[in-house]
Each structure stands twice: as C-alpha cells, then as structure tokens.
Amino acid sequence: MKVLCFGSLNIDYTYRVDHFVGRGETLAAESLQVFSGGKGLNQAIALARAGAETWVAGAVGEDGRFLLEELAAADVRTDHVSILQQVRTGNAIIQNDKTGDNCILLYGGANRAVTEAQADVALGHFCAGDWLLLQNEINQLPYI
C-alpha cells in the first residue's frame, strides 16, 4: 500500500510575542524561527515515520527547495512536487504568545497554483488499495 499526501507545503515563520498584535499596533517579536510546514508536508512526514510508503504532491516556489530536502530526509518521495518559477512557496506567519496560544496568517502561494494536469499525473501513479490524503489548503480539491 502506498500513500499520496496531496497538500500544502509551507514555510512557517514563527514569531514569539508577549501578546497578539492588535489593530493598528506595531509589536516587536521576542524571537523568530523558520520551519518547514504545511498540512501536506507534516502529514507525509508523520506517515513515513509510521512506516508507510509515502509520496507528497503539491507545489513550491524556488524559495521552498529546502522543503523537498527535508521530505527526502524523512523518506518521503517528492516526485509529484512541482517547483514553480515566479511564485513564492506558501507560508504561514505564526504568532505564539507566552500562554502557548497562536494566531496564524496563511499565504497560499504555490499551493494555490496546482494544475489539473499535475493532479492527473500524480494520481496516475497510484491504484486501488493505495491511499489518498487531502486537506483544504490546495486549489484543486474539487477536481481531485
């Protein structure tokens, strides 16, 4: 059995803040960390760690090439990830406050540029008995 995670691949910019920025407010962050993220990426890595033969499909910009390296290091196949020119990788701006709560601003970027042709090619490499895992952060869900 193979699993295809067709979903978002994001760069997460995580800011540690005293409190969430309010309307009209400028707030200095205590720290900034950059992580790989996106529901598709996170789910693919979790499945691979659990022993599943896992592929991910989606899209990144040139700035997201490091996400493919992280997926490969986790034994996730990236054959069906497109690297797009002139489109930024999807990203999340995450505020984490001192209580552990968060607020997230999401930019779809390349996640919103998946094509029907790309979906057809990716899905064509899987068959009955294989699994398809989707989430709502890509643009071709109605087609897929």
Question: What do the PLM-derived regions correspond to, one by one?
Answer:
Residues 31, 57-62, 78-89:
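Beta-strand->loop->alpha-helix junctions that form or flank phosphate-binding loops
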Residues 39-42, 88-89, 141-143:
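Short glycine/serine/threonine-rich phosphate/pyrophosphate-binding segments
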Residues 16, 36, 62, 89, ...:
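A structural motif shared across PLP-dependent enzymes of the aminotransferase-like
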Residues 65-67, 90-91:
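Short Asp/Glu-rich motifs
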Residues 21-22, 61, 97:
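Acidic surface patches and DE-rich sequence motifs
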Residues 1-57, 66-69:
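Glycine-rich phosphate/adenosyl-contacting loop at the front of the ribokinase-like
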Residues 1-9, 69-83, 94-144:
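Ribokinase/PfkB-type carbohydrate-kinase core domain
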Residues 30, 37, 90-91, 134-135:
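Thr-Gly-centered strand-to-loop micro-motif
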